[in-house]
Amino acid sequence: MASSSGNDDDLTIPRAAINKMIKETLPNVRVANDARELVVNCCTEFIHLISSEANEICNKSEKKTISPEHVIQALESLGFGSYISEVKEVLQECKTVALKRRKASSRLENLGIPEEELLRQQQELFAKARQQQAELAQQEWLQMQQAAQQAQLAAASASASNQAGSSQDEDDEDDI
């Protein structure tokens, strides 16, 4: 294992990533903190081992950038050939995701509409939305006003009928 220097702390995998991986892999198992630390150290050492071997392969092929093929060759030469098919699948998935991101970011560029025009159109849409919202609020206010007027009229007619009924009772008392 590599010696523990101050720089090694900077080169470890984030513990949150390891914790997430452990929970996804072993959801019903409790893992002690020292076991988690051991997993972090093993992952870090594995990455150092693979990257060093990939770097040597890269240098032998007189390249300056480590490519996925160099990493795959490193896995093979270190005896991890059984992982290569899965690594290739993950590599393909990563390429697909990256391609989708590039396509999504270039959609705006492919529209052929200047940014100023897009901003103007956006402002128009915002203005229309504000106008529609104001109209809806106005309609709701008018409906509330009509409901209040109807309630007042109903209360007034109920009050008038109550007063008419009570004055008739008084007339009936006078007749007695």
UniProtKB/Swiss-Prot annotation:
Recorded superkingdom: Eukaryota
Family according to the record: Belongs to the NC2 beta/DR1 family.
Function: The association of the DR1/DRAP1 heterodimer with TBP results in a functional repression of both activated and basal transcription of class II genes. This interaction precludes the formation of a transcription-competent complex by inhibiting the association of TFIIA and/or TFIIB with TBP. Can bind to DNA on its own.
Subunit structure: Heterodimer with DRAP1.
Pfam families: CBFD_NFYB_HMF (PF00808)
Record domain Histone-fold: where: 12-75
Nuclear localization signal, short sequence motif: residues: 100-103
Name of this chain's protein: Protein Dr1
UniProt keyword Repeat present: no
CDD domains linked: HFD_Dr1
GO molecular function terms attached to this record: DNA binding; protein heterodimerization activity; RNA polymerase II general transcription initiation factor activity; TBP-class protein binding
UniProt-annotated location(s): Nucleus
Bias type Low complexity, positions: 152-167
Gene it is expressed from: DR1
